[in-house]
Amino acid sequence: MLYNVYDKDGKLIRKIDKKQELSINENEWLKGVTCFVINEKGEVLIEKRVNKGLTPGKLDLCSGHIDGDETQTQAMIRELGEELGISIEEAMNVIKLTKTELPFEFKSGEKMLRFLITVYCLKRKSSDVTLQKEEIDKIVWLPLEETFELIRSGRTKFPKNYDYEEIFEKVRNVYNNKETRKVER
């Protein structure tokens, strides 16, 4: 699998093999996606990652890399299917784009990794999911505002020192059916 490597403005620099991602330098960025999956009760699905990979044991939303020349939406739909067993059809009907290319940095061991993250929101009727046991240890459903506080606190893989309010407001709007921007495949 190849990953595209970008500069901070999102311009493609080069392609690397997945195994080389920890070798990117401080001026290079990868692209990824993340999704607030919300049930009818207004609870957000929080994953606890298994103790391996880039974010061992961390709390997270459904997230992943953009592989090769995938679009952001294709990557998000793939991750929803892989990690949670959500079908392409369901994801395409209800997924909403909330923010594109949020600069995001986190430590993996001693290495600082930089991502340009596209944030999505998926409101669904069911809380039933099928976990990808190779990546996810367990899930919990937390109320929307409690999830926002968890992210702000730095207890997830998301950086603590970022102003998330614009994203949180868009997620609230999706939950309250005020956000109607569908994504294109």
Name what the model sees in each region.
Residues 18-19, 50, 135:
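Residue-level structural signal for beta-strand termini and adjacent loop
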Residues 55-58, 68, 101-104, 111-185:
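Nudix hydrolase/Nudix homology domain
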Residues 9, 39-42, 50, 123-128, ...:
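Short loop segments at secondary-structure junctions
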Residues 46, 61-97:
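The catalytic Nudix box helix
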Residues 32-65:
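A glycine-rich, hydrophobic loop/mini-helix early in the fold
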Residues 1-34, 38-40:
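Acidic, metal-coordinating catalytic segment for phosphate/diphosphate chemistry
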Residues 35, 62, 96, 118-120:
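A structural signal for short, well-ordered beta-strand segments
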